[in-house]
């Protein structure tokens, strides 16, 4: 639950309340409350602003995940699939984009401007296999380049994964991470 909450919003809210309390206490001549409001409120507001400037919002799911697929995920998802899902569906700080380092290591991010942008996730059941689908807007990297890197993507994201790449519409690429684990 905590990763779904923006620390920037918490800092700005709590800091704002304390700062306003400090100003009101100053006007009413309550010295101790005034100092507490200023000494804690203003730094929290500044910290909240700094976090807001470095904030990367969570990536949404393109469809809600059904209970059946959640059960399949709990049984068959690889640690890598779980880590990717958890990382991109929470607030991040100090990163340019979700999966930016991974895309760079895979050779799919020549520059920040040309980097594909992760736009949504989808969890699916393909013939009893758990699939995590990453949808990227990729105006500068062609489908052919993605397909050339398909084997490298599979090796990069670890064992027990098969990777397929598709282009459902122009300049949009989907990367399907298919778990190869068998039901117990």
UniProtKB/Swiss-Prot annotation:
Membrane among keywords: yes
Main location per the UniProt record: membrane
Bilayer-crossing regions: 5-25, 31-51
Domain of life: Bacteria
Membrane-related topology note: Multi-pass membrane protein
Any Pfam family matching the protein: DUF2854
Compartments where found: Cellular thylakoid membrane
Keywords for the protein's UniProt record, in alphabetical order: Membrane, Thylakoid, Transmembrane, Transmembrane helix
Keyword Protein biosynthesis among UniProt keywords: no
GO cellular component: plasma membrane-derived thylakoid membrane
UniProt protein name: Thylakoid membrane protein slr0575
